[in-house]
């Protein structure tokens, strides 16, 4: 039985995958694919702008996949900040829940990501501008009650004008390994997330910003651990082995005795670690790469750092109007129930004009 599809759609094979697109999106071209779906670029004929369209990979294969698809859709719908990727449109070619198998997320198109350009030389001015945007995006995400947990160069999208948007926020859950067998990059992850050794809060993302900023300034990954223990060893070489006050906060007994077994060592001199960085950049790194989560800067505190004085526009440092509501995710729903919720969200979606900054830095990526 052939499925009934909506009118105004056309089919196209993109990178050996069947896509269905509304006729408003022209010239689709493959951009990339990953564990959770594939992305193509297209031109929105109504605006002439290039967009990115993501087709989720088998969103209704299981309850876990369906729940993750629902979360991704809701997170994107919730975001309205120039430094956070948000939703321009969402569509399905299906005409009812009964024949609903696929849906597509339409987002702003960004030329590249930081991972792909980490080898280039960044001036401190460029690092400053990119880190300022990361922190603005994080302040907004955190104000919605979301923690990224897996911030790394690969999910920081940038365009040729050095404008940055955070991707894949709030999706780094325990389901990742279950769904893909994929082990997340630990190099940018805060020690409390890697080791689950103490409570963690939104400053896990600030640690990641510190690691990324350090790499942009030096051209080298700061903590390149081969495994979890090696990662901790690399971190402690820089932060020093903490004293009794810190050890008391550790919940994990094994971590506690391991740290206590190490000879105490002082924190490295960050001016020697980052010899080409300005004193202000060194001071910010020192405060972001703080082992104790209770002493590490928040995104709002980091934005107020003197390093960003020349750039700051508090009007752009906005917060979410309301917290992200994930109450439904605590329910154990069937695939069909998740499908109904997603279909309803798509049917009720109304695009909101994206609010991007009016100012231009005049800076080019390369």
UniProtKB/Swiss-Prot annotation:
Pfam families: Pkinase. ATP binds at residues 31-39, 54. Keywords: ATP-binding, Cell cycle, Kinase, Nucleotide-binding, Phosphoprotein, Serine/threonine-protein kinase, Stress response, Transcription, Transcription regulation, Transferase. The active site is at residue 150. Dually phosphorylated on Thr-180 and Tyr-182 by MAP2K3/MKK3, MAP2K4/MKK4, MAP2K6/MKK6 and MAP2K7/MKK7, which activates the enzyme. Dephosphorylated by dual specificity phosphatase DUSP1. The modification Phosphothreonine is found at residue 180. It catalyses: L-seryl-[protein] + ATP = O-phospho-L-seryl-[protein] + ADP + H(+); L-threonyl-[protein] + ATP = O-phospho-L-threonyl-[protein] + ADP + H(+). Its cofactor is Mg(2+). A motif (TXY) lies at residues 180-182. The TXY motif contains the threonine and tyrosine residues whose phosphorylation activates the MAP kinases. Serine/threonine kinase which acts as an essential component of the MAP kinase signal transduction pathway. MAPK13 is one of the four p38 MAPKs which play an important role in the cascades of cellular responses evoked by extracellular stimuli such as pro-inflammatory cytokines or physical stress leading to direct activation of transcription factors such as ELK1 and ATF2. Accordingly, p38 MAPKs phosphorylate a broad range of proteins and it has been estimated that they may have approximately 200 to 300 substrates each. MAPK13 is one of the less studied p38 MAPK isoforms. This is Mitogen-activated protein kinase 13. It comes from Rattus norvegicus. The lineage of its organism: Eukaryota, Metazoa, Chordata, Craniata, Vertebrata.
